[in-house]
Amino acid sequence: MQLKRVAEAKLPTPWGDFLMVGFEELATGQDHVALVYGDISGQSPVLARVHSECLTGDALFSLRCDCGFQLEAALSHIAEEGRGILLYHRQEGRNIGLLNKIRAYALQDQGYDTVEANHQLGFAADERDFTLCADMFKLLNVEQVRLLTNNPKKVEILTEAGINIVERVPLIVGRNPKNAHYLDTKAAKMGHLLNSKPTE
């Protein structure tokens, strides 16, 4: 186990009242958060979203990505479902950090795509470690998940880490002229499924 559960409190939102659960990485002290809605106990699969931190999209309303749109849509879907979890994964910029993300944006402004920009900075296309999220699910006693994602790699990694992903639920929102090339690149080079139906 790479994390410990350290604190929790109620978090009222426009979609309803969530329970905010804080986790801390044992090795680094980095914090992560889960937002839990309703009763997630029991054997039935839980609707969940693993959402990686995106300051620009989540808090600053950037149109360069679909992150903020996905965050809002996921919370809305979870509330409509009546139960579910959003894991807020503190690995900004696909885990290259905020300043390197700004550098990557500058390269994109020069014509590089999101993958090429990461490579120019010496990073892989995606540096995230989703095994931390598997530990968060385990600390919340969740074993079966209906995962809100367009990223099959997330499904694969969480499955390998012991989480039973019984369904992939697409979350296709927020496409606009400013992020169309970015989304097309994620589909073409990173395998994201952006025109798909749920899989079981």
Curated annotation (Swiss-Prot):
One of its GO terms (cellular component) is cytosol. It catalyses: GTP + 4 H2O = 2,5-diamino-6-hydroxy-4-(5-phosphoribosylamino)-pyrimidine + formate + 2 phosphate + 3 H(+). PANTHER family: 3,4-DIHYDROXY-2-BUTANONE 4-PHOSPHATE SYNTHASE, GTP CYCLOHYDROLASE II-RELATED. Catalyzes the conversion of GTP to 2,5-diamino-6-ribosylamino-4(3H)-pyrimidinone 5'-phosphate (DARP), formate and pyrophosphate. Pathway: Cofactor biosynthesis; riboflavin biosynthesis; 5-amino-6-(D-ribitylamino)uracil from GTP: step 1/4. One of its GO terms (molecular function) is GTP binding. Keywords: GTP-binding, Hydrolase, Metal-binding, Nucleotide-binding, Riboflavin biosynthesis, Zinc. This is GTP cyclohydrolase-2. Its EC number is 3.5.4.25. Belongs to the GTP cyclohydrolase II family. Coiled coil: none annotated. GTP binds at residues 49-53, 70, 92-94, 114, 149, 154. InterPro entries: GTP_cyclohydro_II (IPR032677), RibA (IPR000926), RibA-like_sf (IPR036144). Its cofactor is Zn(2+). GO terms for biological process: riboflavin biosynthetic process. It is an enzyme of class 3 (hydrolase). The active site is at residues 126, 128. Zn(2+) binds at residues 54, 65, 67. NCBIfam families: PRK00393.1, ribA.
